[in-house]
């Protein structure tokens, strides 16, 4: 993929929110990736999610002690994985991979307002050009918050 924003033919390594919205179908309040800060085609993406007190889920999780729900951390990891899968070279443009399963997921620390999640998704495998597996992790200040293997399936 070329980088049309600067006229170069170097591979694109970062994505702003508008570009993420071209690759993922998610929208507010469920788009949980603010930016991709490192990308290597067919291998990995590193994204960030700035966690603010304005997130809707903090209204009920938990009043007086806001914690980002673990399932939403996992969803953010899946969305970063979706950036990699949406651009696999052997997959027709416009195909959608959906999150279908999790293995070995562990939540290791709380994520609170003011944290910045740094999410890494590494491509592991693609079977029958339809089923994919990613290794993912989310860190805050260099400390592991969550990790696991995520499965995806392409839908028609």
UniProtKB/Swiss-Prot annotation:
Which residues carry out catalysis? Answer: 61
**Protein name as it appears in the record:** 3-hydroxyacyl-[acyl-carrier-protein] dehydratase FabZ
Which GO biological process categories is it annotated with? Answer: fatty acid biosynthetic process; lipid A biosynthetic process
Record keywords, A-Z: Cytoplasm, Lipid A biosynthesis, Lipid biosynthesis, Lipid metabolism, Lyase
Q: What is its EC number?
A: 4.2.1.59
A GO MF label: (3R)-hydroxyacyl-[acyl-carrier-protein] dehydratase activity
Main localization is cytoplasm
Give the signal peptide range. Answer: none
Q: Where in the cell is it found?
A: Cytoplasm
Report whether Chloroplast shows up as a keyword of the record. no
